[in-house]
Every structure is written in structure tokens, then in C-alpha cells.
Swiss-Prot record:
GO terms for cellular component: axon; dendritic spine; hippocampal mossy fiber to CA3 synapse; neuron projection; neuronal cell body; plasma membrane; presynaptic membrane; receptor complex. The chain crosses the membrane at residues 21-43, 323-341. Extracellular ATP-activated non-selective cation channel. Plays particularly important role in sensory neurons where its activation is critical for gustatory, nociceptive responses, visceral reflexes and sensory hypersensitization. Residues 44-322 are extracellular. Mg(2+) binds at residues 111, 158. Residues 1-20, 342-397 are cytoplasmic. It catalyses: Ca(2+)(in) = Ca(2+)(out); Na(+)(in) = Na(+)(out). PANTHER family: P2X PURINOCEPTOR, P2X PURINOCEPTOR 3. InterPro entries: P2X3_purnocptor, P2X_extracellular_dom_sf, P2X_purnocptor, P2X_RECEPTOR_CS. It holds the Pfam family P2X_receptor. It is a multi-pass membrane protein. Has high sensitivity to ATP. Fast activation by external ATP. Exhibits rapid desensitization. Sensitives to the ATP agonist:alpha/beta-methylene-ATP. Subject to allosteric inhibition by AF-219. Mg(2+) and Ca(2+) slow deactivation of P2RX3. This is P2X purinoceptor 3.
Amino acid sequence: MNCISDFFTYETTKSVVVKSWTIGIINRAVQLLIISYFVGWVFLHEKAYQVRDTAIESSVVTKVKGFGRYANRVMDVSDYVTPPQGTSVFVIITKMIVTENQMQGFCPENEEKYRCVSDSQCGPERFPGGGILTGRCVNYSSVLRTCEIQGWCPTEVDTVEMPIMMEAENFTIFIKNSIRFPLFNFEKGNLLPNLTDKDIKRCRFHPEKAPFCPILRVGDVVKFAGQDFAKLARTGGVLGIKIGWVCDLDKAWDQCIPKYSFTRLDGVSEKSSVSPGYNFRFAKYYKMENGSEYRTLLKAFGIRFDVLVYGNAGKFNIIPTIISSVAAFTSVGVGTVLCDIILLNFLKGADHYKARKFEEVTETTLKGTASTNPVFASDQATVEKQSTDSGAYSIGH
């Protein structure tokens, strides 16, 4: 029966006014901290009164300019930039290993790791290099025998050290970026209205002196990413050009501006001895008069640039404002919970506070006191006396 009677109970809030300097100061201090947090961080910093659009739409067009000298040849954009379409990802070639006049046929591998003594060492279990292994061990030179392959001959020798194209440090990259936030139908580009043709021809990006110039010097990008140009050009690498659009659309249109930052994206591979840097191969194909095909194979080392666009926009909306305001007012009640814990467990007179805060009333009690007024009877029997706890009042009988 006790379980049943305990189940069918009802609890209601009882207000007790405690006149204590200690608990009063704690209560107001906690409330002040909560209000300061919501006003300073939630509303002013995080702008919780705004609805945000993070689905940024972006297009990037790039153009590289500059001339360099490599292997006694003057190189222009068509020679050292790939792909040529001017996309958000492109490579500036800084070093090349060239293998000319390759034709289909049979020839020995030229690397020391394919050294052999007999045909049994050139079986299919051996990892192929420049072509398909034929299973024969043939003479590479008068002192070296290597496994024979079928493929493009002669095979590539990529262990030679080649110079880098130092002029690439002064090449320029023009970036044209257009963005749109579809939720607000807001569009803008990195070519700001105050930029003229004259400005674009002579300006160079600098984070402080020219933060909105769309023309970037390659050497500056490498430096801003914390890299050394000579080392990066020799091994190759991947750099990120980040364009951030974080816009408060409650402000003027011209306050939404791009912010550029730079980083190396393949930092992990840089530290690896297995495959450091960035390189790739491509070939140029030709035909002789008799119809035979031959090619020039190029192993290119270069700096790959990834233009990464990110951002979000916010604008005032009544719904998030109401939700954040309700959360702020509700959170103020946390101070009451903390003060109750201190009041009922740590202050002097805690037992008296508990007796006044928690009171159990049963039907038997109500029937026994029906002939009297319990409120006045309780008040007459109550004597207030001041405790020694910072002006707190406890209630005694």
C-alpha cells in the first residue's frame, strides 16, 4: 500500500524567501555570468539571432602569366601550365626529366634493381618497371645484365638530377572568383567595384598592403604558405589558396569581402621518404613518314595549386531570435539550482531551510487540523532568529 500511496502523490513548488547576503550574492553572480555569456558570446559573437546559409555556390577561373627558361628553351604558359583551361586546380611545372624518341619494342630495364644473372630471375612475380617483363635476362651494358621488357623503349632514367626553372617564382596567378548564397539570393565576386583596369595591371596581392588584389605572385604564395620555393620546386608539392566568404548580410553590401589564406595541403607526404613531393608523367606523340609512332615522355615536377572557396552568410530572422532568447531566459534558472544546493547543504541552518522548503501534507493531517486555520497557527508558532551566517535568517520553533 505504501508503494501505491507514494505513486499517487503530487508535488508543487513552494516559495521560500531567504534573506542571506551569501546566497544572494551567489545567485546574482551566477545570473550575471549566464546573461553575459548569452549576450556576449551567443548573440554578439555567434550571432544566434540570424539564420545562416552554409551552402555556398562558387566558380573559379584562373590564369597564369610569365616566361621562363628551361633546357635552353624559353617556356610560356602553354609549356608549363596544365590543364590549360584555367580551372580551380592547376599545376605549374618547375622541373622535367625528358626521355625522347621512345618507340614500341623490346629493351632491357635500365635500373639497378632489375639486375639479373639468368632468365629465372625475370619471372612474372617480379614487379614490372617500364613495361611488361618478357622473362629474359639480357645485356644492358658490358658490365650489367637486366631483365628485358616489352613497351616503350628506351626506358626512362628518372634518377638523374635536373635543374629547376627559377623564373617560376615570379610568375603571376590571376584568380576570378564568383560566389552565391542561394538562401538569400546574394551574389558577389572577388573583383571589387573599386578595382580598375589600371589597378589590376600593377597590383600584387599582399595581406596588409593589397588584401583584395586578385593577382598573386607565385613566390609570395609559397612564402605565405611557409615553404621554401627552391625546395618545393625541386620535389613538387600541393598548395592551397583559400578564399573565405564569411558575410553578415545585416550590414552593407560592400562589407562582404573575401579573405585569402595559404597552406600546404600535402604536408604529410612532405615528411615521407617513400614518395615525397608531387610529380606526374605525360607524353607527346609524333609520327614518322612511314607511319611509325614515337613519343617524348616527360616526368614533370611542379607546384599544384588548389583554389578552395568556403564561407557562410547570416541574416536576421525572428525564429532563431525567439529560440535563443527563450534559451537564455531558461538558463537563468540554473542559478536557482546552484543556490539551492549551497543553501540546503553548505550554509549554517541548512536543516531549518530544508524543513521550510520541503513539507509533506497528507489527508490525515488535513482532517486533524480542519477545525483550525493552519496558516495562522503556523505563523503564531514561528519565531524568526538571525543566524551567524552572513546575515542569513533561519527559522526555529
